[in-house]
Amino acid sequence: MTLLTVFRFALAGVSLASIARSDATTSSADWPVYLGGKERSLYSSLTQINRTNVSRLEVAWTYDTGDTDEYQANNLVVGGVLYTPSPTRKVIALDAATGKELWKWDPASERADRGRARQRGLVYWQNENGGERRLFTGVGQQLYALDPKTGQLIREFGENGSVNLESGLTTPGVIYRDILILGGLGGRGAIRAFDVRTGKLRWIFHLIPRPGEVGYDTWPKEAWKTATGAMPWCGQSLDEKRGIVYVATKTAEPDFYGGARHGMNLFANSVVALEAATGKRLWHFQIVHHDLLDKDLPCPPVLLTVTHKGKKIDAVAQGTKHGLLFVFNRVTGEPLWPIEERPVPQSDLRGEQAWPTQPFPSKPAPLMRQRYTEADASNLSPETQQMTLDRIRASPNFGPFPAPSLNETVMFPGFDGGMEWGGGAVDPAGVYYVNVNEIPWLLQMVETRRPDGTPLPRGERDYLVHCAACHGIDRKGLPAAGFPSLLDIEKRRTSAEIAHITRNGFGRMPAFDKIPEPQREALLAYVLGQPAASASGRPDEASAKKSNDKTPPYAFGGFRRWTDQAGYPAINPPWGTLNAVDLNTGELKWKVPLGEYRELSAKGIPPTGTENYGGPVATAGGLLFIAATADETIRAFDQTTGKILWQAPLPFGGNATPSTYAVAGRQYVVISAGGGKSGRPAGGMIVAFALPSP
């Protein structure tokens, strides 16, 4: 019997009482904002479901979007209506008490390019008296405004209902008064604010500084004209009372070679505090200098209040892919505990100038191992242990900041954390709850020139520079991480479709419209296995010589997890954990494995934890709800001890962050279940749990 069959059997007989929706304004019973609030605290004051009764939770309703792709949405609930962006970027409104569909908006109605960006949430806005309401969603490079009651486009917004962002959008922005503050996925780094009624640009802050702006001297002169990256893709948080928005940014590009971007590269890999009304910079802290390892900040800053040295401090906490927590006074930017600059390995790549030091917080302690040593070799079997020992001796790990090299090294902490986009939850007592990955990866750079120094053919060279990081040197991709194989792509898409995607971008893939057309055609010819000149009739070598000086001499060899012979992470467990950290003291309260491989548990191996994507929700009922794991299970943990109090199977992996809300006095916990991560089956379902009806 399959897990989906078991799940459907568990659902059978559940009564789905129809409860009338409310048109009231938002309340504490709602989940009206991505991650629960503009503070991104992932906290709910609801208490109906608590430690004493959580074991009685049952499926209340389900809804199938009909899509089969990764479903990472943190769903909104306002006035008894649940709003979700489906895996194919549809926007759907459901009765939050029954799961009954109320309306559905399909971007195909606007001939929109859906892209493939994982859409993790929506933005709901209403004016003070609730007379004006809008629901914002990103599809491809467009920002759309919908009527929350009908799902119809609001045509007076932007140009006929949408604004061209010139960049994809995976994480929703944040509302301050009547402006929507947004980041993006690619392009030249900037955070922007738009008028919620008209779509007009209200302000812009350049994250790759221009002449006269703070940080301009941390880049080569004139870099702002061509440099890309530093975008805040993971979202923002807002101190609404003070009018301060907090932004977490990504790596400068190219991610793994910085020979053309010498310097610290502000404001990449930084927490930046801006005046929300104007975009004026208030303070910043760069968490990774001159990043060469794609260690961008993966989750939005979280706002909380702690007691520090006997005083109440309004703080902001930022998690990282290294499993580190940086905590600052959110008004002044001063760290609550000292941050040390420590020497890190230097690169031996020609033309690279790695930054000599990197910042490390003295507290809290890292939430994961910071170096893979021989003591971490996998102990699942003698054969596995020997295999991992042999590899770590041949390709040693150099800690959290290995210098990219032509020699292979073990990358640990890995490319996907540490912490990831789910982020952490905080309760009013100042305790931070967060899930962490402990998965090793492999790091290696490749040359874009032949041994004699002459350039590789133009198409192959551009593939290594622009495509191999995700699709691999061998073009096989990494489907488990969402990077498809390009082998035989001509059998799945037409040449025109491939050319359109290459030029305009698609999901996480950036647009290559700035690459000269002859180069783009040579790249396509290489991907399609055609002779280099066949795409345009122009000799490839002439094109290569013309632009040789602009091509990086090295490219990233691709994202590769390190696994053992059976496909498990090639390291001693735990492979995924859930952690509680008291940010009043900076001390770890508890750590437990998150998830399990049932076949290993059946052999008597204690729960190992699994790779995890999606975050936790803390409630005033003393609970933590989290799915995220590869074992297609949602769990409730005791906030005080980390003990599992309840768990239930999901039809697909819950690689999303739950929401909790109440309708007509009944509390629900809802999760998007779409799987697709870690090589697991993909779907597109929403599952809501509640206590049995009276």
Predicted features and spans:
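N-terminal pre-domain segments of enzymes
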Residues: 19-48, 355-389, 538-557
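Mature N-terminal segment immediately following signal peptide/propeptide cleavage
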Residues: 23-70, 74-77, 333, 579-581
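Repeat-blade elements of multi-bladed beta-propeller folds
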Residues: 31-35, 70-90, 114-142, 168-191, ...
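Detector for the c-type heme attachment site
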Residues: 36, 330, 438, 470-477, ...
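Extracytoplasmic/lumenal domain signature
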Residues: 52-66, 91-112, 129-130, 142-167, ...
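Gly/Gly-Pro-rich "capping" loops immediately C-terminal to redox-active cysteine motifs
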Residues: 157, 451-460, 472-503, 508-511
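The canonical Cys-X-X-Cys-His
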Residues: 463-473, 509, 523-527
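Axial heme c-ligation environment in periplasmic c-type cytochrome domains
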Residues: 480-489, 499-543
